[in-house]
């Protein structure tokens, strides 16, 4: 510590604070200390980091660490009103509390707070890392918040962001879709179809469609391919396009993200599950009669906390050169929208 202090021209206490990422040390000084530490071959003691985490978890120390919980949704109240976001947050809070961290919530689209001001608030509160939750229709973070990602370790939940690309935790949508196909086939369905908005699929790099198509390839190698129905916006205005697709494709079970498809089928004269089955790609407790895949978004929230805490312990800050992805396996849930025997 003394050698680093001498090389950087600061006190040993400043070195200690800088290497812990303390907000009490300016970003410029912290960077200088880190350069000197690296030049002198300094490495962090992983055992000490684990000890501090355990002390925070058990309450044996009064250290009160805090993470920022950043609402990236355009709706300020999405954390309370959206059907799935509260599940991510519940998992994140549970894991953060276990590790001794509090969560302070901020809205990224608040017109009264610039990126620079938010960064200043995080420093003042001693916040050293951030969780980004709420990206649903885009994988782009607000440009005016660029300084946040450049200074603080941050992990996104649900989707992989672009420009910048940050580390993220999310459901494994490819294996989810393939597993759903496997389950449908094992039950007895032989003509599974997919109802999905291409905007959503593009957001997750086509992983839902990829899993579905590989399922077709594996289980229907000689059968005619059933093309996904993607005209969601049009069907919401006029069901004729959906009805035409059903008549043409003749699916016996549908995979989808949209509960309204149940109403569409009823209006088209189908009895569920007698005439056709329904499997939800994102099963929700609010519609527990559906069969589907529980994405375990609570575990995604937990994984995001683990990832950002690991980054803090290892002194990782800023936009990563090699972002890390943590994917959570989904769980099959039985329901009344399918019938045994297909």
Q: How would you label these PLM feature ranges?
A:
Residues 1-57:
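N-terminal helix-turn-helix DNA-binding module of bacterial transcription factors
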Residues 244-342:
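Flexible loop/turn connectors
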Residues 2, 40-119, 128, 198, ...:
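Amphipathic helical "hinge" segments at domain boundaries
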Residues 180-219, 318-339:
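An alpha-beta-alpha
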């Amino acid at each position: 510590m003394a050698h680093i202090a001498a090389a950087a021209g600061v006190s040993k206490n400043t070195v200690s604070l800088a290497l812990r990422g303390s907000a009490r040390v300016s970003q410029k000084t912290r960077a200088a200390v880190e350069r000197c530490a690296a030049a002198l071959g300094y490495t962090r003691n992983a055992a000490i980091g684990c000890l501090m985490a355990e002390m925070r978890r058990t309450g044996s120390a009064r250290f009160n660490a805090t993470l920022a919980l950043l609402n990236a949704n355009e709706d300020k109240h999405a954390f309370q009103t959206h059907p799935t976001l509260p599940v991510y947050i519940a998992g994140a809070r549970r894991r953060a509390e276990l590790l001794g961290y509090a969560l302070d919530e901020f809205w990224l689209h608040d017109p009264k707070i610039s990126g620079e001001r938010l960064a200043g608030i995080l420093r003042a509160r001693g916040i050293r890392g951030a969780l980004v939750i709420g990206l649903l229709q885009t994988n782009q973070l607000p440009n005016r918040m660029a300084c946040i990602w450049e200074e603080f370790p941050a992990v996104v939940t649900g989707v992989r962001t672009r420009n910048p690309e940050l580390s993220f935790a999310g459901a494994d949508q490819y294996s989810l879709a393939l597993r759903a196909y496997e389950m449908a086939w094992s039950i007895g369905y032989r003509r599974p179809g997919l109802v999905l908005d291409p905007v959503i699929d593009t957001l997750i790099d086509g992983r839902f469609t990829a899993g579905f198509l590989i399922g077709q390839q594996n289980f229907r190698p000689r059968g005619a391919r059933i093309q996904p129905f993607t005209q969601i916006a049009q069907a919401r205005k006029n069901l004729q396009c959906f009805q035409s697709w059903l008549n043409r494709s003749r699916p016996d079970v549908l995979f989808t993200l949209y509960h309204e498809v149940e109403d569409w089928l009823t209006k088209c004269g189908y009895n569920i599950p007698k005439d056709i089955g329904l499997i939800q790609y994102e099963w929700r407790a609010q519609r527990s009669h559906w069969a589907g895949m529980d994405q375990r978004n609570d575990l995604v929230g937990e994984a995001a906390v683990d990832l950002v805490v690991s980054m803090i312990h290892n002194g990782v800050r800023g936009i990563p050169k090699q972002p890390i992805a943590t994917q959570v396996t989904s769980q099959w849930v039985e329901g009344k929208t399918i019938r045994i025997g297909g």
